[in-house]
Amino acid sequence: MYDIKTFNAIAPVGLARFNEENFTINKTETPAGIILRSEKLHDYAFPASVLAVARAGAGTNNVPVKQCTEDGIVVFNTPGANANAVKELVIACLLLSVRPILKGSNWVQTLTGTDTEEQAEAQKKQFAGTELEGKKLGVIGLGAIGAMVANDAYRLGMEVTGFDPFVSVDTAWSISRRVKRAQSMEEVLKTCDFITVHVPLSENTHHLIGKEQLAQMKNNAVLLNFARGELVETEAVIEALAQGEISNFVTDFADERLLHNEKILVLPHLGASTEEAEVNCAKMAARTLKKFLETGNIKRSVNFPTVEMAFNSPFRFTIVHRNVPNMLGQISTGIANLDINIDTMINRSRDDYAYTIVDIAETDEAKINAAAEKIQAAENIIRVRTIKNAEAVSY
């Protein structure tokens, strides 16, 4: 039985994925898994029981990923589950950036008298805008969201250029061939009328858009940030707007320094705030966490490699270890020395860590436990789990 601890309100349809036969929700102080949205876990004391954390959303900067990795805790996210919601908001804000819709609507609310229609017609010219068709959009980051923004902007008649040196094969196939691929971020900054940023936050992308990058942009360019606030250097943007280096800034991340500036549109982090996105993220997070706890298979992890193998044997070892030479030999020898036969084995690595799954043709739990203890005691081993396949075990 696995207990799942929740932070924030998780959509019930997602939690329903955890069947009552194998899972409980918030019943103990020693959960096997954690599922959350925006709760910050950097000061959270993780119980030793925690095997995995599933973030119902794309970003994981609210989770101490490095600490989790060192402790053998797998961290999952839900890439693409909220992509459509964010994409729609980006498209809406592209339109808002060229058409003063909000100003016009607010102005109409101030009209008095019985001739409001005549007043509106007489003054509407002050709210004239421009069109997106034919304008150039630069998309920095072509993940699930960036790819969708690029495709839909092209359908609106924009000339779209994308830049992402690490675009995945799957995403690359989904991007319209009409979207031009830039060879550098500088190319995007210098040539586009609108720049929208869609990259994850990391040490390498912190202040990805700063003073130097803003100086490269057109002086009538509009910058949009719906990824993470820290990707854009706030003070540099304010200065660039004041000096006329760029035209406008649209962001989904509130900062008191950005308020009360007519050149800046600030939203209260609405990107994924749709009913559909909340449900999609909860379902994906629950599904991924459930599969990992029941089988040890890893998919959509931000700190460990994708490792999946059909579970047909009576028992399975999953082993988190350092990515150093001779680990597989050490593991397999330790198992074989106890007269346990290995059915199948798979190993994948990611940076300094690796993950190994070993399926064994053994049902003697005393021998299995002894093997697990022996593996755990070996050098460079971080965590060992033993998973019983109820459907395969027959006594």
Task: Enumerate the language-model features and the residues they cover.
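Oxidoreductase and adenylate-handling cofactor-binding alpha/beta cores
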Residues: 87-106, 151-158, 284-297, 332-336, ...
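A conserved regulatory-domain signal marking ACT and ACT-like small-molecule sensing domains
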Residues: 299, 303-395
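Rossmann-like dinucleotide-binding domain for NAD(H)/NADP(H)
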Residues: 161, 219-311, 338, 355-362, ...
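N-terminal Rossmann-fold NAD(P) dinucleotide-binding loop
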Residues: 146-147
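An N-terminal-biased, well-structured beta-alpha scaffold segment characteristic
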Residues: 1-78, 210-212, 233, 345, ...
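Glycine-rich Rossmann-fold phosphate-binding loop(s) that bind the pyrophosphate
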Residues: 142-143
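Phosphate-binding beta-alpha-beta segment of Rossmann-like dinucleotide-binding domains, i.e.
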Residues: 79-136, 300-302
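Rossmann-like adenosine-cofactor binding region
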Residues: 42-44, 165-258, 273
